[in-house]
Amino acid sequence: MPKFKTHRASAKRFKKTASGALKRGHAYTSHRFHGKTKKQRRQLRKSALVSHSDMKRIRQMLSQMK
């Protein structure tokens, strides 16, 4: 039986919180800010939590992450 490996691309994008939830960054933050309002840009800077519907799939990819 082979060892399970952490999906490295996912490990770089998600961080586990103390309560076990997963933090993620927002999309649409690399360029083209002139089309976004100040409020949108400010809100995109903050991190968000992964939704419960995606949690199982992402936890499988991060199975070996501490």
UniProtKB/Swiss-Prot annotation:
Q: Where is the composition biased (Basic residues)?
A: 1-16, 23-45
GO cellular component term of the entry, any: cytosolic large ribosomal subunit
Sorted alphabetically, which Pfam families does this protein's record hold? Ribosomal_L35p
What PROSITE patterns does this protein's entry cite? RIBOSOMAL_L35
* Keyword Mitochondrion included in the entry's annotation: no
InterPro entries on file: Ribosomal_bL35, Ribosomal_bL35-like, Ribosomal_bL35_CS, Ribosomal_bL35_sf
Gene Ontology process terms (BP): translation
The protein's superkingdom reads: Bacteria
Write out the ranges of the annotated region (Disordered).
Answer: 1-66
Alphabetized, the UniProt keywords read:
Ribonucleoprotein, Ribosomal protein
Q: Which SUPFAM superfamilies match?
A: L35p-like
Q: Which GO terms describe its molecular function?
A: structural constituent of ribosome
* NCBIfam families, per database record: rpmI_bact
**Family indicated by similarity:** Belongs to the bacterial ribosomal protein bL35 family.
What is the protein name for this chain?
A: Large ribosomal subunit protein bL35
The organism encoding this protein is Lacticaseibacillus paracasei (strain ATCC 334 / BCRC 17002 / CCUG 31169 / CIP 107868 / KCTC 3260 / NRRL B-441)
Q: Which gene name does the record give?
A: rpmI
